[in-house]
Curated annotation (Swiss-Prot):
Pathway this chain belongs to: Carbohydrate degradation; pentose phosphate pathway; D-ribose 5-phosphate from D-ribulose 5-phosphate (non-oxidative stage): step 1/1
GO cellular component: cytosol
Enzyme Commission code: 5.3.1.6
Native source species: Saccharophagus degradans (strain 2-40 / ATCC 43961 / DSM 17024)
Protein name: Ribose-5-phosphate isomerase A
Subunit structure, interactors included: Homodimer.
Keyword Isomerase: yes
Record Gene3D superfamilies: 3.30.70.260, 3.40.50.1360
CDD domains assigned to the protein according to its UniProt record, in alphabetical order: RPI_A
Reaction(s) this enzyme catalyzes, per UniProt: aldehydo-D-ribose 5-phosphate = D-ribulose 5-phosphate
Length: 226
């Protein structure tokens, strides 16, 4: 199977996972990226079975609205039973690197609200050690140089993502040359640097379910109980 076919398979698997649980008044959390886009297209056929969605990016919001799915402000929503989104890397603990699409802050906020985070990814995203994919860090523009210097002290090689302004009006540093063996600790350490909005490690609050597209079919993994 091609990578696109694997993405399509996991998008379908995510739809199959949530369909039995949909209710008329339910609002879903929807992520950003190529796999999330496929999921939104599949979800559109079932838009009458739930109330609407909260989205992690303007791009996803426009796609949802284009399908006639209402999009809500998270501040008006009391609960999100499910959040469905992709990842740039995932390890065995369901710790993730996200943010290749520069939507990491909104993704992390929605993840914090959601009861269950369902991550959908193809097998190329499955890694033993996080960090081959550059770790995005969203920063307040005036703090970019300061944050970059602090990241160098941690062993990373930060590169300013040119011509990228996030939906929050911030900038992205992509951090190379990291082998991340303690993702929760690094996530907390980076977030404590003045000027960092957040970083793309999802380890303090990892995925609950990983639907991984492989050549042998979709593999379902669950986060270990604390």
């Amino acid at each position: 199977m091609t990578q696109d076919e694997l993405k399509q398979a996991v998008a379908q698997a995510a739809l199959d996972y949530i369909l039995p649980h949909l209710e008329d008044d339910m609002i879903l959390g929807i992520g950003t990226g190529s796999t999330a886009r496929l999921f939104i297209d599949l979800l559109a056929a079932h838009k009458g079975k739930f109330d609407g969605a909260v989205s992690s990016s303007e791009a996803s919001s426009e796609q949802l609205k284009g399908h006639g799915i209402p999009v809500y402000d998270l501040n008006s929503v009391d609960s999100l039973p499910f959040y469905i989104d992709g990842a740039d890397e995932a390890n065995a603990q369901l710790h993730l690197i996200k943010g290749g699409g520069a939507a990491l802050t909104r993704e992390k906020i929605i993840t914090a609200v959601a009861d269950k985070f369902i991550c959908i990814a193809d097998a190329s995203k499955d890694v033993d050690v996080l960090g081959k994919f550059p770790l995005p860090v969203e920063v307040i523009p005036m703090a970019r140089a300061h944050v970059a210097r602090e990241i160098v002290k941690l062993g990373g090689n930060p590169v300013h993502r040119q011509d990228c302004v996030t939906d929050n009006g911030c900038q992205i540093l992509d951090v190379y040359d990291l082998a991340i063996h303690d993702a929760p600790a690094l996530e907390a350490k980076l977030n404590n640097i003045a000027g960092v909005v957040t970083n793309g490690l999802f380890a303090l609050r990892p995925a609950d379910v990983l639907l991984l597209g492989t050549t042998n079919g979709v593999e379902t993994r669950f986060a270990a109980k604390p």
